[in-house]
Amino acid sequence: MARKAMIEKWKKEPKYKTRAYTRCRLCGRPHSVLKKFGICRICFRELAYKGEIPGCRKASW
């Protein structure tokens, strides 16, 4: 779980736009965030298994 101080800092508008970075909306994780969904890979996987992300299927080839 991300530190609460870092999550609060992330929510504020940065002084310069280049300082902005992605962070998971659910858990606050700063790494491996899928921009299309706005959540990290771990949260994405959990939601996909539950069927809460429409149109998402497990790959099989």
Swiss-Prot record:
PROSITE patterns in alphabetical order: RIBOSOMAL_S14
HAMAP family registered for this protein in UniProt: Ribosomal_uS14_2_B
Biological processes annotated in GO: translation
GO cellular component, one term: small ribosomal subunit
Residues holding Zn(2+): C24, C27, C40, C43
Note describing how the cofactor binds: Binds 1 zinc ion per subunit.
Protein name per its UniProtKB record: Small ribosomal subunit protein uS14
Names of the cofactor(s): Zn(2+)
Assembly notes: Part of the 30S ribosomal subunit. Contacts proteins S3 and S10.
GO molecular function, one term: rRNA binding
Organism: Clostridium perfringens (strain 13 / Type A)
Family: Belongs to the universal ribosomal protein uS14 family. Zinc-binding uS14 subfamily.
Keywords: Metal-binding, Ribonucleoprotein, Ribosomal protein, RNA-binding, rRNA-binding, Zinc
Task of the protein: Binds 16S rRNA, required for the assembly of 30S particles and may also be responsible for determining the conformation of the 16S rRNA at the A site.
